[in-house]
Design a protein with these regions (language model features):
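Domain-exit/linker segments immediately C-terminal to small folded modules
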Residues: 169-241
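Generic preference for hydrophobic/aromatic residues in regular secondary structure cores
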Residues: 3, 12-15, 26-30, 48-53, ...
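Conserved small-residue
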Residues: 1-143
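Extended, Lys/Arg-enriched charged tracts that mediate electrostatic binding to polyanionic substrates
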Residues: 141-169, 178-194
Length: 241
């Protein structure tokens, strides 16, 4: 649940009223820790307090690029472009990346890497970085799209929740989703802060989040422990291959 906190140091206050707000709080805490030298916040047993103006699209995208770095093809491409020479296999991989998904095709068009145009590719990445992050993040099936309607990323509060299982397309018939076939009984509160839910889940093929919300500090600790356990398991699985 989101509360206004007027005339206080922080103007926004979140409580873990259900799993959605619990997960959003975990994601937001990671966001604020990433910007710990720029932004302030307070976490108590009951509330996460912060200033709403500190949540911006530019900051969100920069955080997402860092947090899910290995999921962004432009980051892999960027690392290749920082090399001084390239093997045949590396050149092949670079050209695969240039057409890796819809937004990569849009940004790089018909460009093919020939060993002499690394600076051109670097410049295109830098100029189009926000679009590359946003479109990849919202449309990739194991990122935002795994949790919410990709068309709702960065949208203001809607008439129904952006999360799958709660989202109702207003242009389609929705009676089957409502108790006793009455659409007016379908309750689905939305909040732009639900965009932080993907950062609360951990896993590889399956993702997990523990709603241990006896207190917010306990919630954070439990999910930090889960994160470490999943990382260890993934590392062990990679070693055994």
């Amino acid at each position: 649940m989101r509360l206004s906190n007027d005339n206080e140091k922080f103007d926004t206050c979140l409580a873990a009223s259900d799993w959605r707000y619990s997960a959003a709080i975990v994601g937001l805490c990671k966001y604020f820790k990433y910007y710990k030298h720029e932004l302030g916040y307070e976490l108590s047993d009951d509330y996460l307090k912060f200033n709403a103006a500190d949540i911006t699209e530019d900051r969100y995208l920069k955080f997402a690029e860092s947090y899910f770095e290995d999921q962004f093809q432009h980051r892999e491409l960027e690392k290749y472009m920082n090399l001084e020479s390239w093997s045949e296999d590396q050149t092949k991989r670079i050209n695969e990346l240039l057409r890796g998904n819809s937004v990569m095709k849009k940004v790089f068009g018909k460009i093919r890497f020939d060993g002499n145009n690394s600076e051109e590719i670097r410049e295109l990445i830098q100029i189009n970085r926000s679009e590359l992050i946003r479109e990849t993040f919202r449309n990739k099936s194991n990122l935002y799209k795994n949790f919410a309607n990709p068309g709702q990323l960065f949208k203001e509060r809607g008439i129904c929740c952006r999360l799958w299982g709660y989202y109702v397309d207003g242009g389609r018939k929705t009676k089957a989703l409502s108790y006793n076939f009455d659409v007016n009984t379908f309750v689905s509160q939305d909040d732009p802060l639900f965009d932080f839910i993907p950062f609360a889940f951990w896993g590889d093929r399956e993702v997990f989040f523990v709603n241990d919300n006896f207190s917010l500090e306990q919630l954070i600790r439990t999910n930090e422990t889960l994160e470490k356990q999943v990382q260890m398991q993934v590392t062990e699985e990679q070693k055994s291959k």
